[in-house]
């Protein structure tokens, strides 16, 4: 097994599967990206996995149909960037149909876990994200629980996925990376 495989975005418009069972040894989860141009709509059916779609930048309007019912109906989210703005996220279970529309264009990350059954679809606005900021000075960072592990924030939304973000905070953000002290 090779641990040196590099997975790159192909800058494909629409849904792009980046890491999956088909191209990696990942047997429990996958990763993808959605790119939509201004005015573009994307619609697809989710099969064999649950998805957490996390908006990185831009705007999106979401619809999710599940078991013959429209559960998420035109919910809207927007985000300027990952450092300054809290995310908007969408949970989509297996066997659901998702439709996304972007007025100004969007980029989102898609986190997947392979399963045949999921929970109800859920639109998670920024005000329902738990954020913390541990550390001091250049070691300060922000964590954001989007869909948490059991006992944490939003732990009842997904079946298998745990989704969150970690970003650096000012003044360390100017470097856009986190560092640790060198060891001898």
Each language-model region and where it sits:
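Hydrophobic, proline/glycine-rich low-complexity stretches
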Residues: 1-43, 50-63
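A short, N-terminal "cap"/entry segment at the start of jelly-roll beta-barrel domains
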Residues: 1-27, 113-174
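Conserved hydrophobic/aromatic beta-strand scaffold that supports enzyme active sites
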Residues: 31-35, 52, 89-91, 110, ...
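Tight coil/turn sites that cap or link beta-strands
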Residues: 38-41, 93-96, 105, 166, ...
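A generic structural signal for residues embedded in beta-strands
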Residues: 44, 62-63, 92, 100
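Short amphipathic beta-strand/extended segments with alternating polar/hydrophobic composition
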Residues: 45, 70-77, 123-124
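Glycine- and acidic-residue-biased ligand/ion/polar-headgroup-sensing regions
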Residues: 47-72, 165-184
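Ligand-binding loop in jelly-roll beta-barrel domains
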Residues: 76-118
